């Protein structure tokens, strides 16, 4: 597995923060690094496989990656993101207690992926741009300024994350996308889902298509197929059982959709013919 080292990304040995844009981010194999990062998705779509679990990412997705996490990008489509790198929560010169603002693992679950709305994303861009402008300065005032901006970024993300920001339809759509990540195997009635998140069905279709490039049902099918591919690689369950566990009532229909999406059959994936290294 590829290991990315801080010496290749931070401007100096005592720099606590670095900005690494990926405009665009192409498919990239599984890797980890000896630093932490906050991945901010500007626009486009892709699949982010984080510690073996696939997540669909779009504009407004924010991912918190620790130094022991492994991840990769695939099925990217005009995916543009900015990585805010930092060595460790306790490796800042002027800041302490940052862990309290970062996602915390509870009962083995790490809430790695957050979502923010478009207006917050604009504010995030401004903070990141200010950090980037000062990146080459190594004096103490510049270091302190960058760290203050980093703290402001964390505060903005925490205050604006889905759980606390439901005042407009874009935020409610983000919450709906997060809900689908947890309920992808359920039978989804789009009228009921639209009501649940206080969206009209027309608004749901329009905004989801704008955000992901897919219709709601196409998005749900892709999400189910990604989860199924993960189970094919990492479980001993039969193809039929996996199809049912991922929301498909007909295993033959599942196999047809799977091949159409990945150009491999479920059996091919199970046997590792796609070249994936487990």
UniProtKB/Swiss-Prot annotation:
PROSITE patterns: HTH_ARAC_FAMILY_1 (PS00041), HTH_ARAC_FAMILY_2 (PS01124). Transmembrane segments: none annotated. One of its GO terms (biological process) is rhamnose metabolic process. It holds the Pfam family HTH_18. InterPro entries: AraC-bd, AraC_XylS_family_regulators, Homeodomain-like_sf, HTH-like, HTH_AraC, HTH_AraC-typ_CS, RhaR_RhaS-like_N, RmlC-like_jellyroll. Keywords: Activator, Cytoplasm, DNA-binding, Repeat, Rhamnose metabolism, Transcription, Transcription regulation. GO terms for cellular component: cytoplasm. It comes from the Bacteria. One of its GO terms (molecular function) is DNA-binding transcription factor activity. It is found in: Cytoplasm. Disulfide bonds: none annotated. Residues 174-272 form the HTH araC/xylS-type domain. Residues 191-212, 239-262 bind DNA. The record marks 241, 250 as: Interaction with sigma-70. HAMAP family: HTH_type_RhaS. NCBIfam families: PRK13503.1. Activates expression of the rhaBAD and rhaT operons. Binds DNA as a dimer. This is HTH-type transcriptional activator RhaS. It comes from Escherichia coli O1:K1 / APEC.
